[in-house]
A protein has these predicted regions:
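Active-site glycine/GP-rich loop and adjacent strand/helix microenvironment
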Residues: 35-179
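Conserved AMP-binding
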Residues: 15-18
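A short, structure-level motif marking secondary-structure boundaries and short turns
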Residues: 11-13, 94
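Conserved short alpha-helical elements in the N-terminal third of ANL/AMP-binding
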Residues: 24-37
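Conserved adenylate-forming
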Residues: 1-10
Length: 179
C-alpha cells in the first residue's frame, strides 16, 4: 500500500506510548517490518510529542524517499499546521499518513492531502480499526476510499450503500485472523 518495498521509508510513530497500548502495538508492528531486513524501513517513536516529531521530519526526512506518520487524526492535523509554522514545507517530502482510533470525514482527508504533502490521494492516507486485545481487525484500501468518496459526493449512492448510517461510515477490508 505505501510501497515500502520500493522506497526507503521513515515511519514516525506519533501514537501515544506508555500505558496506551495502541502506540506500542504500532511500534511493535513497525519494528517487526524493519527487523525483517527486507525493506529500507526505519522507525522512530516520538509518541504524541509534536515538537520531537517535527524535529524528526526536518532532520531525518531528507534522508528517505518517503515519510509515513502514524497518529490520531487530530494530532496529525496539529503536526501539519505546526510544521508549516516551524518552516516545514510538507510538499518537499513524499508524505503518507496512517491513522487509527478515530473516524474522520472526507473533508478532513482532503485537508491532510492538500496541506500535508500527500502526492497520491488514494494511496497516501489509510485508516485502520482494531482493539487493544485483538490488534488491527480492518483497514481502508484504495477501493474503499473511492467508494466512500463517491458515496459522500452523491446522496443516492450514500443512501444505497449506507442505508442506516447517520454519519460518514468507513467501508473497510477485514484482516483475517492468522495473517
Amino acid at each position: 500500500y505505501f510501497e515500502i518495498d520500493k522506497k526507503s521509508t521513515l515511519f514516525i510513530d506519533c501514537y501515544a506510548l506508555g500505558v496506551w497500548i495502541g502506540g506500542m502495538f504500532m511500534y511493535q508492528a513497525a519494528r517487526m517490518i524493519a527487523n525483517t531486513g527486507k525493506y529500507q524501513f526505519s522507525v522512530i517513536t516520538p509518541g504524541a510529542d509534536k515538537i520531537e516529531a517535527l524535529k524528526a521530519v526536518k532532520r531525518l526526512g531528507p534522508k528517505f524517499d518517503q515519510i509515513i506518520i502514524g497518529g490520531y487524526g487530530p494530532l496529525v492535523k496539529d503536526l501539519i499546521d505546526m510544521g508549516e509554522m516551524h518552516g516545514i514545507t510538507w510538499g518537499d517530502y513524499e508524505m503518507k499518513y496512517f491513522f487509527a482510533a478515530e473516524g474522520f470525514t472526507e473533508g478532513f482527508r482532503d485537508y491532510v492531502i492538500q496541506r500535508g504533502g500527500v502526492r497520491a490521494s488514494f494511496y497516501g492516507t489509510i485508516n485502520h480499526y482494531g482493539t487493544a486485545d485483538l490488534g488491527t481487525m480492518a483497514h481502508e484500501t484504495p477501493l474503499s476510499i473511492i467508494i466512500r468518496r463517491l458515496a459522500v459526493e452523491k446522496e443516492e449512492i450514500f443512501s444505497d450503500v449506507f442505508a442506516e448510517a447517520h454519519r460518514q461510515p468507513f467501508p473497510l477490508e477485514e484482516v483475517p485472523l492468522g495473517l
